[in-house]
Amino acid sequence: MILSLQGCMAVGKTTAIKYLQKNAPYINVSYEDHTDVIEEVKRRGLDKNIYQDYLEIQKLWLHKEVERYQKAIEFPCSIMDFGAEEIEFYTINYPKSIGADWEIENALKRELDEVRKCMPDRILFLDASDEVLRSHKQNDSTRTRNFFEHHLQYMMPLKRAWFIRRENVDVLRVDDLSAEEVGQKVKEWCDIYRR
């Protein structure tokens, strides 16, 4: 069983994952580890705002996600801190968020087909108001979140619409929940769906 946590930056995904590690050791946690992709992008001097470079960058990300999924399915139940659904969403929608009308589906058909075979069984979309997200961001000094405002303003409207319409997505509003309560709710959700 592959589960995935979704939502905006600063919504509480990492905090919920840490809660699971402490309170649900029977669930394998699969974090996004993108250090090698970022290093390769820098080494090659790729710019995500240039079409051909963007395609090369996304090939790296898509390949990385397929590898990650293959490791996650070795466990009876894994939860992804963003799964294949995130890289699919971002690959298709980032150009729209910068006003670009790039052809993505055909240009990355093989890679998108492969990542689409890696989709989670269930997705829990953690959602909160923009005010709560900004507050969480301000109170978290452990991360820089340089892309936060762009993500909130341009990506989140697309992301909400993209995920809310999917049949395998559940939504958890976290506006009035403490970090502990979010962790508990995420654990309860996992326990319902894990086999």
Identify the residue ranges that each predicted region occupies.
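Walker A/P-loop
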Residues: 14
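ATP-binding Walker
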Residues: 11
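ATP-dependent NMP and nucleoside kinases share a basic, alpha-helical "lid"
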Residues: 80-141
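Hydrophobic anchor at the beta1->P-loop junction of P-loop NTPases
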Residues: 5
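P-loop (Walker A) phosphate-binding loop of NTP-binding proteins
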Residues: 8
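Conserved substrate/cofactor phosphate-moiety recognition/catalytic segment
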Residues: 21-67
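NTP-dependent small-molecule kinase module
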Residues: 135-195
